Amino acid sequence: MASLDVLIVGLGSTHGLRAAEDELAGSLLRAGADAMLVRAERPREVRTLALTDLMWARAARRAAVESLAEAAPRAVVYSTTTAALLWPQPGAVRFDAPAAGNRPGRHGVWQRPVERRRLREAPLLVPQDAGALVEAGSPTTESVIVPIPVEPSDGGAGGVRDIAALTYATNPYKKGLDRVLAAWEAVRREDEELVVAGLRGPDRPGVRYAGTLDHDDYRALLRRARVYVTAPRREDYGIAQLEALADGTRVVTTPAPGPYAALPLLAGVGAEDGAPVGWVADPSPAALGAAVRAALDDATDDAVYADRALAAIAPFRRAAVDRTVAEELLPRLLRP
């Protein structure tokens, strides 16, 4: 049986999750660990969230069992609490948001109690933000916070900003697309266009739907946008907002329940100069629209804003995350 330092059991159920899993594996490898990432095989589509989670948890268990039969890892990391629900052996749990927060009522009827047990039994928790621990009930299990690394995309800031505003709305209700559209209608000027990524819909004056895009194409749109706007009803992390900052795009948002790691940064909480790098407003059309208008009309030079935004996301950059993985996470995973 082959030896291995760290086995990561991932779900890979979304592009964002796959990217986060790849980043964790890469960071462990750069820290000198012999790490391997395996992913669950996508199950068939089912109708309810509770059954969907069961199917994914079973798929993650199968992937873990098969890999454990071939290797003897010193540590196992389950990527998401769903991957850990039916684990074949205890391991660290990596998560952005717990079922306690994003599976209310009947949607999480079986997941929440099992999750509480797993978070107690795990040797280590690896949340992506401190807010995820709070939403999980502040478990006493030892934890290391490891953010998702965010970097400027190829091309970075500095290009032509020929799109007034961009939003991402694969899940329209959760992302608050109705709020964004109402605010946009209230403040847009004749020559300004809002591009809606991740969704098909009927174009109308001032609004264009870009549909589903691969990540490179999406980031290319982001580099062209002056403002990224979102009004989520719940935000598990806020990776799109961090990517916007990484590419020098001004960000307008609303407060939202959930860990929402990007929100304090956008509001200027903890900033050395106390200055926010985003515009945070109430979700009403008047308030959100005013924030969108203020961001669009912001007189700060684009290059100056891009430099400020990059400085603000320094804790989320790959170099910072690599230090946390090498100095804090890996020693805890591999200790006797």
Describe the function of each predicted region.
Residues 77, 82, 86-106:
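Active-site proximal beta-strand in glycosyltransferases
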Residues 250-254, 260:
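Short hydrophobic beta-strand element within catalytic cores of glycosyltransferases
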